[in-house]
């Protein structure tokens, strides 16, 4: 009997480096947020929760591991 490659599955959630569309501020956010994530500079909404993966309203620059 063959063993599966990953005995411990990796999480599907990630941290993302995003750039605010309004002011250009770069910020690190979670991909599955429980609350609204706002820009620290201008207050614009960057990510909205949906009960799972959030709706990202900013430009994704990098996916952090």
From Swiss-Prot:
Its cofactor is Zn(2+). Signal peptide: none annotated. InterPro entries: Ribosomal_eS27 (IPR000592), Ribosomal_eS27_Zn-bd_dom_sf (IPR023407), Ribosomal_zn-bd (IPR011332). One of its GO terms (molecular function) is zinc ion binding. Disulfide bonds: none annotated. It holds the Pfam family Ribosomal_S27e. Binds 1 zinc ion per subunit. Zn(2+) binds at residues 20, 23, 39, 42. It comes from the Archaea. Keywords: Metal-binding, Ribonucleoprotein, Ribosomal protein, Zinc, Zinc-finger. One of its GO terms (cellular component) is ribosome. Coiled coil: none annotated. A zinc finger (C4-type) spans 20-42. GO terms for biological process: translation. PROSITE patterns: RIBOSOMAL_S27E (PS01168). Belongs to the eukaryotic ribosomal protein eS27 family. Part of the 30S ribosomal subunit. This is Small ribosomal subunit protein eS27. It comes from Thermococcus gammatolerans (strain DSM 15229 / JCM 11827 / EJ3).
């Amino acid at each position: 009997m063959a063993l599966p490659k990953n005995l411990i599955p990796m999480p599907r959630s990630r941290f993302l480096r995003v750039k605010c569309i309004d002011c250009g501020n770069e910020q690190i956010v979670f991909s599955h947020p429980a609350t609204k994530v706002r820009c620290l500079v201008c207050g614009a909404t960057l990510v909205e929760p949906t009960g799972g993966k959030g709706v990202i309203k900013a430009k994704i620059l990098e996916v952090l591991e």
